[in-house]
């Protein structure tokens, strides 16, 4: 006996929240599930999911921008007599100040076995794996204001007056294992159930970043086009948790109830002698 399902989704979640500049969020998913009765006492369930998220916005569209616009008055002019955007409206920053982009891929797989060797006795073994790949790029382009003579003046909007590029990539692996068993039995007016199991989770992540300033041309805001202040670095971290648990349930005539729980957990967050 088998059952399966699959679906594909593509959604343009947010095609812009601002009138100046461009911001957009796109999301794509692909899901599949399959289940099979391997035997009268064994079942297999498997699922896979892929998710892609693409996000783009002006690099100036941060908390500082929203903080500033909350202090503007409805009477503030939008353009000057020469037809240029007024500096206080921060429109040039949104339109010409650079772009922030983020691309995120997640691939998840889950596998579960269910065994029933005896009536009332179940054994479960579950495993999950999630792979995440993320790429973030940001470029900052200086902008200009114009004086009364319509002459351009370089403006520092809080991020300097030189071109800047930042690139960050990271990969994260997540693993989870759950193995547990339960047994329930009734005799007369007595009903009981016992549950025992263990849980293990682990994260591994590494990243690499680089930055630079002074682009050869603002039309190609890439790291390879920066000429000064070139920097790079990387990082790695991991953490893990493990737990053991048990539960005993008893009731008499479905009226008098008793439940006992036991759990022991450990985490790599703490020093070895205190985990």
Predicted segment positions?
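Short glycine/threonine-rich loop-to-helix capping motif typified by GTGT followed
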Residues: 272-275
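Residue-level signature of outer-membrane beta-barrel architecture
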Residues: 32, 36-37, 113-117, 183-185, ...
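Transmembrane beta-strand segments that form the barrel wall of outer-membrane beta-barrel proteins
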Residues: 9-13, 258-270
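Single conserved hydrophobic/aromatic residue that forms the stacking wall/gate
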Residues: 1-4, 8
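Active-site and adjacent substrate-binding regions of carbohydrate-active enzymes
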Residues: 120
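Surface-exposed loop/interface segments of Gram-negative outer-membrane beta-barrel transport/assembly proteins
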Residues: 17-23, 29, 33-108, 124-242, ...
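Structured alpha-helical segments in the cores of large, soluble enzyme domains
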Residues: 242-252
């Amino acid at each position: 006996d088998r059952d399966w399902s699959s679906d594909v989704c593509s959604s343009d979640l947010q095609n812009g929240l601002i009138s100046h500049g461009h911001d957009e969020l796109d999301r794509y998913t692909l899901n599949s599930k399959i289940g099979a009765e391997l035997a009268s006492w064994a079942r297999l369930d498997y699922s896979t999911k892929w998710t892609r998220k693409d996000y783009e916005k002006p690099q100036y569209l941060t908390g500082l921008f929203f903080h500033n616009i909350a202090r503007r008055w409805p009477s503030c002019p939008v353009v000057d007599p020469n037809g240029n955007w007024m500096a206080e409206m921060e429109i040039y920053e949104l339109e010409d100040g650079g772009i922030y982009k983020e691309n995120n891929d997640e691939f998840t797989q889950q596998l579960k076995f269910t065994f029933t060797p005896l009536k009332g006795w179940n054994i479960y073994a579950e495993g999950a794996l999630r792979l995440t790949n993320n790429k973030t790029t940001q470029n900052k382009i200086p902008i200009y204001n114009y004086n009364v003579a319509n002459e351009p003046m370089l403006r520092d909007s809080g991020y300097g007056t030189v071109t800047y590029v930042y690139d960050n990539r990271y990969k994260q692996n997540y693993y989870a294992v759950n193995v547990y068993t339960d047994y329930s039995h009734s005799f007369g007016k007595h009903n009981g159930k016992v549950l025992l199991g263990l849980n293990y989770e682990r994260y591994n992540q590494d990243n690499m970043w680089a930055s630079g300033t002074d682009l050869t041309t603002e039309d190609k805001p890439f790291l390879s086009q920066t000429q000064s202040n070139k920097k790079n670095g990387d990082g790695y971290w991991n953490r893990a948790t493990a737990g053991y648990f048990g539960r005993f349930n008893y009731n008499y005539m479905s009226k008098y109830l008793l439940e006992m729980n036991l759990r022991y957990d450990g985490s790599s967050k703490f020093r070895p002698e205190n985990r």
